[in-house]
């Protein structure tokens, strides 16, 4: 919602101010299609050159994430803590043998299937199961496990940030591409140097539309979208760190309740359930 409001404000203020200042939209309307084809087409081509197919798909998905916002909400954080509580409690009370059935086939696990949204995220499931699998193989050094988890998180986060970096790269190039379009317009104008001043003025005005479009697209649309996507990715990345915090706390010998409380402390403030809310969720999950 807010990105759409922001776009409306950007367009309204820029073009509304131009209109109130007595600007003539005919020049913009007449020149914009060709200028946009040159600038937008060149920017798209540069994006294709600098990315492989997976990268381009990521950029496409990233644009939709700009509009939809972070993937994980307050309930999802609560569900994640409840899931980790049940798994660590099972491991603590019944041992690794009872846990193996859940981590080897999470799609058939009664515990995992309580949380369908979490199960749809392959990284969440794989990250939890792979780490617990390491624990069942007697890798119980908290520092080694934490180091291994941190490397997985860094790799995943680096890959997740690629669409934002690609969009930012496009934004950085748009002003220069706008200048390219403007220069081509000036070249065209110089070929008609014998025309009367009013004709030359119109042609120069059309050429400058290219500079305007390049800067406007860069700083009014694409750049802010890249910043928003970066913020969304960073916020979603906090979700996966909760898994690390809870499982490392469990390896340090803490009870399941204490481990998830440590994880709750790492939840972003706007998403953080209260102690009472989490306790109620854990009780409900255990009884289910």
Can you annotate each of these PLM segments?
Residues 1, 62, 71, 220-221:
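N-terminal start-of-chain detector that recognizes signal peptides
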Residues 19-163, 235-288:
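Large intracellular
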Residues 5-8, 12-27, 145-148, 152-232:
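Helix-termination/interfacial motifs at the ends of transmembrane alpha-helices
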Residues 2-9, 34-38:
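Alpha-helical transmembrane segments of integral membrane proteins
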């Amino acid at each position: 919602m807010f990105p759409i409001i922001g776009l409306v404000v950007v367009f309204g203020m820029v073009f509304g101010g131009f209109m109130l200042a007595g600007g003539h939209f005919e020049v913009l309307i007449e020149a914009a299609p060709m200028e946009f084809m040159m600038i937008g087409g060149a920017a798209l081509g540069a994006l294709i050159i600098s990315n492989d197919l997976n990268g381009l798909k990521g950029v496409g998905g990233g644009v939709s994430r700009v509009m939809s916002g972070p993937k994980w909400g307050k309930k999802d954080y609560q569900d994640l803590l409840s899931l980790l509580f049940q798994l660590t409690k099972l491991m603590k009370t019944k041992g690794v043998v009872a846990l193996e059935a859940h981590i080897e086939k999470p799609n058939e696990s009664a515990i995992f299937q309580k949380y369908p949204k979490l199960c749809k995220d392959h990284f969440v499931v794989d990250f939890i199961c792979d780490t617990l699998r390491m624990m069942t193989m007697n890798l119980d050094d908290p520092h080694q496990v934490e180091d291994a988890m941190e490397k997985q998180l860094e790799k995943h986060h680096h890959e997740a940030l690629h669409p934002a970096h690609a969009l930012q790269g496009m934004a950085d190039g748009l002003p220069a591409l706008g200048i390219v379009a403007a220069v081509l317009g000036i070249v065209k104008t110089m070929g008609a140097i014998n025309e009367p001043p009013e004709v030359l003025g119109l042609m120069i005005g059309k050429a400058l539309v290219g500079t305007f479009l390049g800067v406007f697209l860069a700083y009014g649309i694409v750049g802010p979208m890249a910043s928003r996507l970066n913020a969304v990715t960073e916020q979603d990345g906090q979700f996966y760190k909760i898994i690390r915090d809870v499982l490392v706390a469990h390896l340090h010998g803490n009870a399941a309740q204490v481990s998830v409380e440590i994880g709750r402390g790492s939840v972003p403030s706007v998403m953080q359930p209260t102690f009472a809310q989490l306790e109620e969720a854990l009780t409900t999950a255990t009884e289910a």
